Amino acid sequence: MGVDLSDINDSLFKLSDKLSNDLAKQRNLCIVKEPSFSIEEHIKCFTTCINTYKPFSCLKHANWALLLAKKKSDTGLIGYCQSLRGLAYYLLEQYQSSAICFGFALKHLKKEDLTKWQVQLDSMLTIVHEQQNQDTSSLIPDECPNIPELEAAKIEGDEEFLNMSLKAPEGQIEKNEEKLSNRIRYDWSQTSFSLNIDIYAKKVKDEDVSLLMEKNTLKIEIKLEDGSIFSLVLDPLYEEIVPEKSSFKLFSSKVEITLIKKVSEIKWEALVKSPANNSVNVYAKDSNHSSASGNTKNKAKDWDSLAKLADLEEDEPTGEAALANLFQNLYKNADDDTRRAMMKSYTESNGTALSTNWKDVKSKTFETKPPQGMEPKKF
């Protein structure tokens, strides 16, 4: 599919009359003085727009870069541009379109390019596939957009660029704040004696958290970076907790709440007894015990078996205790001759030798032979 690069430049400069001087300076971050754009220049513009969070402009430059890559028939570059489209759609919260573009990217990448990008692409595909249920977009992108669609999208994108650059109306600010709150997700897991809830909110300070824990209730409010409030109310809890022993910790990427069960060994099937009582300001819980707006798979994890295994491992002796335990087990299950051999060799050598063969031991005297680098001392 061919493209007249002069049309691209003309369309860009037709919009200059709509921009104020300040906006024109911002816009110049994504244009060049030459009469046409190259693929590299579109990719640079994409990077600039993504750093300033302008997803419509990101999609515009990714689409034009893809057309130029198609013209060159460079499959590796085509795959890379498709991944840029996928990222742009992801920023626009059009997750189904994003997944399709990442699929195009995987199809076009060469083997060596695929190896380099596989982890990132697989990671993004996992995220967007899990968010497809939240996708309200009716747009399903073609593998390569046509010129009229690009022109229309480009103008719409630039108008969006203007709207994002200018001060948003008061109602739009409230809408954006609500959308940021919608991105907060949480999940939970449990052991036989505790229940852990992770709320994935970044850079939360202690003074930004309001927490109430009672035996049947958990209420938490978190002030987010943009000033909006995320709240979670669990009432009544599935089982009673011990508030005075429960706690929370702040990390750079999450708030971690640890609830101590009043009755251990009871497996919680949910956080609350009735889903109708689970009040969250931005989402409801699903059957997988994860937030409906979550970005990753979150299932309630039953750590009971792992916790018991960990307890067993902690109880297992190590070092000298392990050696003494081995000696006791051998001695307990041995016959009389073996026991005599063990006692004679162990005591005569001051614990540096152990033999179970009485025929060899009965006429032998054992010397103290400490490990290399150590010396025996008399007391």
From Swiss-Prot:
Organism lineage string: Eukaryota, Fungi, Dikarya, Ascomycota, Taphrinomycotina
Ranges annotated as biased composition (Polar residues): 346-358
Gene Ontology terms: cellular component: cytoplasm; cytosol; nucleus
Function per UniProt: Involved in cyclic AMP (cAMP) pathway, possibly by participating in the assembly or the conformational activation of specific multiprotein complexes.
GO biological process, one term: adenylate cyclase-activating glucose-activated G protein-coupled receptor signaling pathway
Domain of life: Eukaryota
GO molecular function: protein-folding chaperone binding
Protein name: Glucose-insensitive transcription protein 7
Record domain CS: where: 181-272
Domain SGS: 292-379
Region (Disordered): 345-379
UniProt-listed CDD domains: p23_CS_SGT1_like
Natural source organism: Schizosaccharomyces pombe (strain 972 / ATCC 24843) (Fission yeast)
Pfam families listed in its UniProt record: CS (PF04969), SGS (PF05002)
